[in-house]
Amino acid sequence: MKKLFSLLLCVVMVFSLVACGSKTDDTQTPDEPQDTAPELSGTMKVVATGDVYGPLFDAFTADTGVEVECLSMSSGEVLSKLRAEGGTPSADLWFGGGIDAFMSAKDDGLLEPVTFDAAAELGDEYKDTEGYWYSKGITIVGFLLNNSLMEELGLTAPESWDDLTDSQYEGEIVMSNPAVSGTNYAVVNALLQAKGDQGWDYFDALNNNIAYYGKRGSDPKNKVSSGEFAVGISYIDASIEQAAEENDLTIVYPSDGMPWVPEGVAVFKNAENVDAAKYFVEWLFSSDDHLRQLAEIEQKSGIKVIKPSIEGIELILRSS
């Protein structure tokens, strides 16, 4: 077990145990018109954590004429791919994933810095001081239960992280591998810090119940939805809520705390269309309209933490 998680202790980050919901205000102040976009062309290739961002990228295309191609990939996969590509990235923009992977990419010299005036409005802890990455939101983590399978197996619903170590869940828990998933890397960090000296004992007990460590962040959602496993440790966002509605699943917000992790945005060094990618970062963060659109797509309000001055978004803290 310790071998699985040992590499996760290289970076120590503090993650609060709380969760953010999403709500937009009815009254919004339109943005001031932005400066004319620079002369851009071609296609911007994006690696993202999901395939739901089409409307946002369509808006960028409408403003700039730059077409966008998007590939879904976890942050750990992106980092491994970057290193394998040896300084010649196949994509231009990195959109989403745990911020620890972005920090590692910066240290490895794989990112291109981006600076723009509106960055001053972002919280210092949610951006790199040299502009190598910015946070676009916050991901929270909870549990996803297959109601039919839980009933069939006679399982009681877990309410806390400690509950997951109960022997009744042996062989019925799925979790994305923290060595690949930036979000679950953050979960490990947060729980180790919260539990102190008992942290490794906790993960030894949890490991006894986990039947499968997925390679993708979406594996818990997919495998719980299909009935392969009863319990998934998963990020919680709009796609999870939709899956819960469509597949008779229950989302559980752990009573003993919900780890959360900032999600990154960055431009790859030596990217083929680096100008378009750098402008996209400025385009996104310089416009409250674009950030509100992103919040609506993700059904998250965490951008309010990152950019407190944004109007039209109300931060909601979930406890159940």
Report each predicted region and the residues it spans.
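A bilobed periplasmic-binding-protein/Venus flytrap-type ligand-binding module shared by bacterial periplasmic
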Residues: 144-149, 189-192, 261-273, 293-296
